[in-house]
Amino acid sequence: MPDSKPWQGPWKAHRLRLKAHRGPLFYASLQWELFAWLRRHEGEIDAIWCNDLDTLAPAVWHGKLPVVYDSHEYFTEAAGLTGRPLRRAVWLTLERWAMRRLSCMITVNESIAAAYRNKYGRDVAVVRNMPRRQPRVCVKGREAFLDHGVPTDLPIALMQGAYMDRDRGAAQAVAALPEMKGVRLVLVGAGVEWDEASARLDDLEMEGRLHCISKLPFDQLRRLTASADVGLSLDQAGHGNYEMSLPNKLFDFMHAGLPMVVTARKEVAAIVREHELGEVIEEASPVAVRNAVMKVLSMPKSDWQASLNAASEQFHWGVDEPHIERILEQSLKAHLADNQTK
């Protein structure tokens, strides 16, 4: 993609150059390039790990290697397919065709796993997308926000998201800001609702308390998160994917020691309530958001740290990482056994 950053991961990576960057042509280009790459390198590959439904067809069509389907969301119930029956039917057809040909499937939480088990009658493992356990970021005052031009004279409510699509809650957070007197709202990320918020920075009703920061490297985002006063996760109902989602920002807030206000989506609300990490609201009306934010801010941030620290010890990558090796081993064995019976 044109805005892709240079790869800095610990393993070798190959980037595909696509002829289209959006719409149906993007997906068609992606499928072709993936399939062509697999054909060129098939002698070098032992197994294929597919992230989400839009990478699955070339791997399954290739047909010669074990395929692990890693579904990061309930793809066919995503917001982008709501109200688009033809597009959704295409993806559902692909999903049904591929499911019978997988070696293994994993997803990010038990709710989505249960939905797939009920739908296709197959085993689905759960590997949650949680951060590694590491020392908490040490921040000096609010310098991280000052570095991005955000004054630190008021408490800061933070919402972050790589892509703030419709109904991810950014619009609701902005609508609530006039009600949240004495609070600054910072949106970090990109997307449709981030763009709309950016266009309202000078609105009189925002009183100069709305701030938008473009997507940041993870280390910089961690510093901002640790420096904020309350985190917001306001996914809306109406899409099966959002209803069952377990967004990364929940764990980012947790590991940064940041109390949070969340909407009552199933997985998120259960964790926040059980571990006393903040406030859960049934709907993200301006008044409900304001009341919850003010309730969290009425307690010193230090008072939340015991429950946040305890949750961080329970929810981290070290808990689920061992499942990866087990899943790959099972997939390879199943593939070999299947080939021997043919």
What annotation goes with each model-predicted range?
Residues S103, R209, T225-E243, L258:
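Acidic donor-binding loop of glycosyltransferase active sites
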Residues E196-L224, V230:
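Nucleotide-activated donor-binding/catalytic signature segment of Leloir-type glycosyltransferases, i.e.
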Residues V150-R168, A173-L177:
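Conserved donor-binding/catalytic core segment of Leloir-type glycosyltransferases
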Residues W32-E42, A57, W61, Y69, ...:
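Membrane-proximal helix-turn-helix segments that form the acceptor-binding/catalytic region
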Residues A284, S298-Q330:
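A charged, aromatic-enriched C-terminal amphipathic alpha-helix characteristic of glycosyltransferases
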Residues M1-F26, S111-R117, V126, G191-V192, ...:
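N-terminal strand-loop element at the rim of the active site
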Residues T76, R88, L92-R142, L146-D147, ...:
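Donor nucleotide-sugar binding/catalytic pocket of nucleotide-sugar-dependent glycosyltransferases
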Residues E274-H275, E279-P286, M294-K301:
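Conserved acidic donor-binding segment of nucleotide-sugar-dependent glycosyltransferases
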